């Protein structure tokens, strides 16, 4: 009977920005537990620009949750998606492992100029909104030109966080939502960089499960989902 139920379960495929990894997993679990009919939700995490390209090329997703508003709007303009919506506001954080001698909480972005810092991880600005936001704050602070040769680029913001966790970089500019995740919480020191990334989504035009996609989009706006997002620093205003 269980095998039959799984076989008959509706399926929802979500293309989601990497900063959502832990928050969205919690939201999916909460949503799935409330369903009366079998529902299989499959999130695929990556850089928003890469997911955007996959959807353009026909990847079978139902919902796109980007780390910006640009990519969803471009999909809609190209006829690949409909029904734009805002669901979160992301923030940048400067993060170092607990073992680092850098006092990032006190020094903030000036930590990046410390002589001990040889590699600084950011997400690739070519296709990751968090990478573009990192470059923007570095330029605004007037230190981008000084540290540009020290930058190492992660494929997405989650990989960027891994670089710093594993010693591939001395310090990283990553998503606050990842800093607050179970795998990073209490394992490092961070400075929240004044920033805000409006994060938007859309329903993919080719979705074969539009009604299910619309229901999940509705849940993202619920008090329960907003509470989960807020716990990861992703509260929308």
Regions found by a protein language model. Give the residues of each.
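Bacterial N-terminal signal peptides
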Residues: 1-5
């Amino acid at each position: 009977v269980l095998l039959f139920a799984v076989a008959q379960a509706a399926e929802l495929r979500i293309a989601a920005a990497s900063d959502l990894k832990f928050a969205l997993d919690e939201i999916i679990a909460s949503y799935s537990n409330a369903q009366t009919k079998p529902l299989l939700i499959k999130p695929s995490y990556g850089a928003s620009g890469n997911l955007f390209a996959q959807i353009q090329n026909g990847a079978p997703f139902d919902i796109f949750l980007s780390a910006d508003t640009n990519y969803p709007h471009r999909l809609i303009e190209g006829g690949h998606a409909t029904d734009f919506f805002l669901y979160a506001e992301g923030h940048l954080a400067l993060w170092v492992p607990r073992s680092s001698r850098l006092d990032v909480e006190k020094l903030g972005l000036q930590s990046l100029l410390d002589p001990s810092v040889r590699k600084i991880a950011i997400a690739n600005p070519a296709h990751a909104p968090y990478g573009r936001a990192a470059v923007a704050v570095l330029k605004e602070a007037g230190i981008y030109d000084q540290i540009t040769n020290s930058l190492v680029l992660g494929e997405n913001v989650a990989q960027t966080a891994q670089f710093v966790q594993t010693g591939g970089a001395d310090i990283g500019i990553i998503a606050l939502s990842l800093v607050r995740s179970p795998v990073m919480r209490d394992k490092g020191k961070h400075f929240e960089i004044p920033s805000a990334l409006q994060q938007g989504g859309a329903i993919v035009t080719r979705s074969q499960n539009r009604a299910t996609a619309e229901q999940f989009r509705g849940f993202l706006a619920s008090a329960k989902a907003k509470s989960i997002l807020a716990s990861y620093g992703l509260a929308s205003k």
